Amino acid sequence: NFDFSKIDSKYNNAYRSHVYTYDKDYENRLIPKHWGRPVVIYLDKKIPKEVRKDFMFFVSLIPKHQNFKISFTKKINEANYYIKNTSEFIEHKTSDSLPQITYNLITDNTYKMIGGILKMNCQSLGSLENNKKLLRQYFFLSLCQFCFKNSIESENSLLSKKYILSNSLSNYDSVLFITHYNYYNKVPMKFDQFNLAQRNIKKLGNNAATYFKSMLSYE
């Protein structure tokens, strides 16, 4: 259930900046995207074993949420998310991109993500540590349509380009992830609706829950 006590918390502006963005590399990112189906991952066996092991541990750190399910499969035909090692050269595609790793997602007509592929050139990425770090980061981006922010100085956040490997998920990343899937809805909440909701919620106080549920219309 949505925690309405945190609607206007300090994380609201952070959430807005990571999800509702517009730049030269995107036609329009003002519509939030969520995974509309359980994410079933197939990990390419050509990815180094140590990297695969670290990634499976990382996935176990992702917060549990009623609107988001994730699992692994050993059968590629059962997966809707393929993480692949490639020998191809991978170029920059967006300002979020680094060479040698990228992802592409399939969405339905309600902007729900239903499938994806993450490609990485493990050899060109260099060290095992670099492979682990970037796989974690790019996979996390793909779950929530998040983007990196240069303003994040913390080495603990996956959304920082200064991120270093950790055995835990930062509170910052956890709150943003949970917030994103709290906003899960059949009809996406566009940028102007999000801003309107935030303004009205601050005015309504204890009646905020009723108002917010009306904004998350399933009709």
Model-derived features with residue positions:
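Disordered inhibitory propeptide/activation segment of secreted metzincin zinc metalloprotease zymogens
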Residues: 1-43, 47-49, 59, 206-218
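Catalytic zinc-binding patch centered on the HExxH motif and its immediate surroundings
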Residues: 24, 30-34, 50-51, 88-114
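Extracytoplasmic
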Residues: 34-38, 65-67, 76-80, 113-115
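Acidic helix-start/capping segments at beta-turn-to-alpha-helix junctions
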Residues: 39, 43, 71-93, 155-162
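Zn2+-dependent metallopeptidase catalytic core
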Residues: 50-72
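Sec-exported extracytoplasmic/periplasmic mature domains
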Residues: 60-68, 141-148, 182
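Metalloprotease/metallohydrolase-associated module, dominated by Zn2+-dependent proteases
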Residues: 103-126, 149-219
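Active-site recognition of the HExxH zinc-binding catalytic motif
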Residues: 120, 132-147
